[in-house]
Design a protein with these regions (language model features):
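Assembly/oligomerization scaffold segments
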Residues: 1-283, 334-335, 391-449, 496-504, ...
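Solvent-exposed, polar/charged alpha-helical surfaces in well-ordered, non-transmembrane soluble domains
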Residues: 294, 326-334
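C-terminal, non-catalytic macromolecule-binding modules
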Residues: 441-471
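C-terminal, active-site-flanking charged/polar segments
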Residues: 353-359, 440-442, 446-452, 520-557
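N-terminal export/assembly leaders
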Residues: 293-321
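Short beta-strand/loop turn elements enriched in aromatics
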Residues: 182-208, 300, 463-496
């Protein structure tokens, strides 16, 4: 019997504290290097002369004369009662304020038993203090503290005759929601990908967890919700018979709590694109799409992405105005005939889709199948602009300004701008930045681009019997005539796939964009071949998906005779 489960791993970290930290101590052995505590280096548990420390079975290597993997090895060994003559002390300094819900310590060998931590603000005032009983080599010291500039970590007791051996600190920890973590009441994943890239749909993950201790309640002033940051990364997984399958990387969008039930809403990489503005557009005359995609991703702060070579090489013609990164990327991908997808991946991937079958949905996995025909489309029209630079310079705008630095965004592209009453410091086709030394009228002039809209239409040769002509229209701002014709024909071919399927089935890693062979419940009538365009998955109710697909009917004729299989004979139980 199949068993499933869901969990999300949330990195509850102050993401800038490690790089901003400087660790110091006066209690380290000469061979220890405390600066390496900023790195998660592998440190073996060396055999030492601590009393009754290790067996002579080869599990503890001999320490070399000059080890390069020892971070902190206290200068003093604990006594018979586990205390120290002078407690080992670590001090961590920061140049900026930091906030964390906890500190995670990584020790080597026998961990200390007790420690104290003091949090200090930028003025030298102690803002929090806590004592901890350490119970593992990876120990999480929970304490929600805001705006600290200094940490003082004092080790007060260990096992008898032991050194404190510390190797790494993290300014936070992973929070698990679901399997082996906070219990999740329900979880739903909605994934969508438009194969013609007329829109970039956002994948959304929503789950409700049972918050017995009010850790996520905004009213709890010491709750871990205080370190929630919009855009923090969450890795989501589904387990099938104990084996974890990656659902994707998601980012915190919003959360709320009602009666100990916290609702966490997350978006994928495509959702991040909507939160950032792309200002680097211009008038393009054949520049490769890959360069522009790199600029869009940089503007959105996304580094984990791939772009296939065919998409990278596609030329762009037209203009990209100032707008959010998702809308900008839609223009580029529509022109390229490429899609963007992040499902079942740690990265976001951009590529030209194909109709290669990646998965098979057998009868044994299906609960229901509802086929229907989509509306008939006979014509596809694609409108695109053609820009030409005017010969003469004209006034673009004028206004009165007091001394200062200003940036003016343009509603239409211009070039070769000049100014009276100020000094231009930066200009692009989309905006101009200038400085004003004295109050007065500022006039910006330049050569404007004239625009002419053209439309290319792809049509079927003959309208199907009983149908009438129906046109679908699209617009793209970075196409030329040849590309518009190719895109119109490709979209028309897509609309020729009129079969729409709605199926409910047991998911085994199936994802949007993939093409699937869906077996018909009636074995006499072949199967369906279709691309998964949208899928909603119940992550806590059996990993059951409801998907919408578009494709065609694969008819299996009875008029074949191949090998030992004859007409009418079953050719495999699916």
């Amino acid at each position: 019997m199949r068993t499933t489960g869901f969990y999300a791993k949330y990195g509850l970290y102050d993401t800038t504290a490690r790089e901003d930290s400087t660790l110091t101590t006066a209690y380290n052995q000469s061979f220890g290097d405390i600066s390496k505590a900023k790195e998660d280096i592998s440190a073996p548990d060396y055999g030492t002369l601590e009393q009754d420390y290790f067996l002579l079975d080869g599990t503890h290597p001999e320490m070399p004369d000059n080890p390069d993997d020892v971070v902190f090895f206290s200068s003093e060994m604990s006594g018979a009662d586990g205390t120290f003559t002078e407690n080992p002390l670590l001090i961590i300094l920061f140049t900026e304020n930091h906030t964390s819900a906890c500190l995670t310590f990584h020790f080597v060998g026998d961990h200390p038993l007790e420690m104290k931590i003091r949090w200090v603000d930028g003025s030298g005032n102690y803002i929090e203090y806590a004592s901890y009983e350490v119970d593992s080599n990876k120990f999480v010291a929970w304490k929600q503290v805001e705006n600290y500039r200094r940490l003082e970590i004092e080790f007060t007791r260990a096992m008898p005759y032991r050194y404190v051996k510390f190797r790494y600190i993290e300014y936070g920890t992973d929070i698990i929601c679901g399997v082996d973590g906070y219990p999740v009441k329900e979880a739903k994943l909605v994934e969508e990908c438009d194969p013609i890239s007329n829109k970039i749909a956002i994948n959304k993950l929503t789950f409700k967890l049972i918050d017995e201790k009010n850790d996520f309640d905004i009213g709890n002033m010491s709750g871990i919700h205080k370190v929630f940051q919009s855009g923090q990364k969450v890795m989501a997984y589904e387990t099938i018979n104990g084996e974890a399958q990656l659902l994707g990387a998601f980012f915190l969008d919003s959360y709320s709590t009602t009666k100990n039930i916290s609702t966490i809403s997350l978006v994928d990489y495509k959702g991040l694109l909507s939160k950032h503005t792309f200002r680097g557009g211009k008038v393009y005359t054949g520049e490769p799409a890959g360069e522009v995609i790199d600029q869009i991703m940089a503007a959105a702060g996304i580094t984990a992405y791939t772009v296939d070579e065919a998409t990278r090489a596609a030329p762009l013609y037209g203009w990209l105005k100032i707008q959010d990164c998702r809308k900008t990327l839609r223009e580029v991908l529509f022109a390229c005939g490429s899609v963007i997808d992040s499902s079942r991946s740690e990265t976001v991937n951009i590529y030209k889709p194909s109709r290669v079958i990646h998965t098979t949905i057998q009868r044994s996995r299906k609960f229901s199948t509802t086929p229907k025909n989509q509306s008939y489309i006979s014509d596809v029209a694609v409108k695109f602009p053609v820009y030409s630079l005017d010969e003469e310079s004209k006034e673009i705008f004028k206004s009165t300004y007091v001394p200062g630095i200003y940036t003016v965004d343009l509603s239409s592209p211009s070039a070769e701008m000049t100014i009276t009453g100020g000094t231009i410091t930066e200009q692009t086709n989309n905006y101009v930045t200038f400085t004003v030394a004295e109050e007065g009228e500022v006039v910006i002039s330049g050569r404007k681009y004239s625009k002419e809209d053209l439309t290319v239409t792809a049509s079927v040769e003959k309208v199907d019997a009983g149908e009438s002509r129906e046109t679908k229209s699209f617009t793209c701002t970075v196409l030329n005539a040849s590309q518009a014709a190719d895109r119109a024909q490709a979209i028309l071919d897509y609309y020729d796939l009129r079969l729409n399927l709605k199926i409910k089935f047991l998911n085994e890693g199936d994802k949007v964009v993939d093409w699937a062979e869906v077996f018909n419940a009636n074995r006499k009538f072949g199967s369906y071949v279709a691309g998964i365009e949208k899928m909603t998955t119940d992550l806590t109710g059996g990993y059951i998906s409801t998907a919408e697909l578009r494709g065609y009917y694969k008819l299996v004729e009875d008029f074949y005779y191949t090998g030992e299989i004859i007409a009418g004979e079953e050719f495999g139980e699916m």
